[in-house]
Amino acid sequence: DDSDLTVVSSGAYWTIYRNTANGEYSMRMFGNVPSSRPTAWNSYLKSIKHIEIEEATLTGSFASYFRNNVFTVLESVRIERSNLSGVTSFEMAFYSPTLQKVIIRDNDYPTAPSLRTTEYMFGYTHKLTELDVSGLDTSAVTNMNCMFNYCSVLEELDVSNFDTSSVTTMRDMFGSSGKLEKLDVSNFDTSSVTTMQAMFYGCTSLEELDVSNFDTNSVTNMSYMFYNCAGLEELDVSNFDTSSVTNMYGTFVGCNSLEELDVSNFDTSSVTTMQAMFNACRALEKLDVSNFDTSSVTTMQAMFENCTGLGELDVSNFDTSSVTTMAYMFDGCTSLEELDLSNFDTSSVTTMAYMFQNCTALKSLYLDNFTTPKTMTGMFTGTTALTYLFASHNLRAFDGLANTRWYDEKNWVQFSNYKELQMYHEYQREPTGYRKGVFLSLTMDAMGGQFEDAEEQKVQNKVSGEYWEEVVPVKEGHYFDGWYLDRNFTNKFDFSLPVAVSTTIYAKWVENYTVVIPASISLNEATELKVEGINRGSKTLSVGLNYEETTISESNKLTLSNTADTTVQCLAPLSWDGSETNPKNAILTLAPGSEITEG
């Protein structure tokens, strides 16, 4: 009520009042308002709580004008129906933790606006709950750094009509304004912007944010751009032109509600840092970075740390030749089951500390070209599900790897603990694959026979659940009658059962059948074919020969099969009249379908 206001001081463009009802001080400004503050205000600066500027013309720089180090208890500022064309700066103008309300509306710009910077204009206004900037012409502004930084309790902010066509920097523009629930930046012209660093940093309450029309062609810095935007469920950055971006440090860190994020078209050829780029994007189940050009990247520290929902991740095309740090790179990726880093060039890497820490679902890991870095503390800590590790011989340690039984999958060397594995790997001269667990052995005793390598024993190594391979040996004058678990041949071995225990099996042999054919035979003449044979087997010999399917070897032997059981076979030595001068008679001729049967 104006009736309670008493004038305590006044000047050409200002009046200071005291409210007799509550004892509060306020000030009104009007007319031509310069950017300087008269000394007459000094005794009231620590008392004035409200400032109203109406029908005034402001000229010059109003940087830090209403700041808390000047007006120490200021709670509200209202600028209405005033000419703001001559204002050149509002930098830190309202930078005050005591301000609760700022209204800038219905103002005039009879000439082109002079305002060039709004940096920190409302920075650190921790108590600001009401803000109207509809009367602010930003068409000439080039610097909006931290403009609304730390508007900690502000829930509503309308910047939909901002003209940002001249803005070159938006660093931390809305940073740490954690209570903002809505923010319409869909019409922002960002064609001149070079930095968007931390632009939406800590906007934890935003559930929607439309940046799909952002022109990022000139942007070089996107570090922390969406840091901890924990409420965002959707974010369309698929059209971002990132060809000029050099810094993607923490770009999406903490966006833990995003279920999808399309960065497949990102041009990362100029990016030098991807540290923590996707850190704590916990809801992401897929992330396509297969086309990333990482040839300029020097740090990938914590790049995918705590991406707990990722079930797969293709980084096989990453060029890591310039990377110096991979510490924590996949730390906490608790859903990843396989990582193929076989193409990683780690020759420049100095630290891999905790690189795979707590990748609790990781089963297979390929480190074909890794080299030993200066620091690898806890590199494999928490990889409890890891059952297969293929590692370069130039990677000399596996710090944090499960202290359990492993074995060399190629040479079948068993290690009872991590220390034995470590010592063994130090002497390798080529990449080696290791499997967790105990391997089982099948010893195959040929019992007087031989395998293809002329050995009388063959040993297979498998792990539980796999299947043994049946290998058939040979023995002069005998045919093979199967594998048995005992030397008495009473318990036949079953290859169709999965591997369960180590064991030895024995080959059973049966002496061959002997068939003697008369010296002179011909099926094309009347000469009777006679066969003399001795059957030393336990089954009836029934031999069928077909010219189209059977040939005679140089050793003059035919393989005869038992028709009742084709797995039973024997070699039939042949002899006949013939000589070098009569080669025709040295050829055994059998008509198609002809059979030889002897009981």
Label each region the model flagged.
Residues 1-13, 388-442, 482-484, 509-510:
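Extracellular/surface-exposed low-complexity segments
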Residues 14, 29, 51, 339, ...:
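Extracellular/surface recognition and adhesion modules
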Residues 24-32, 46-58, 71-88, 97-116, ...:
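Structural signature of tandem-repeat unit edges
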Residues 68, 404-415, 466-495, 570-579:
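Surface-exposed interfaces of beta-sheet-rich extracellular modules
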Residues 68-69, 381, 447, 469-477, ...:
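Acidic, Ser/Thr
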Residues 416-434, 486-506, 559-561, 587-591:
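Serine/threonine-rich, repeat-prone extracellular segments and beta-strand-based repeat modules
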Residues 525-536, 558:
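Short beta-strand elements of extracellular/lumenal beta-sandwich folds
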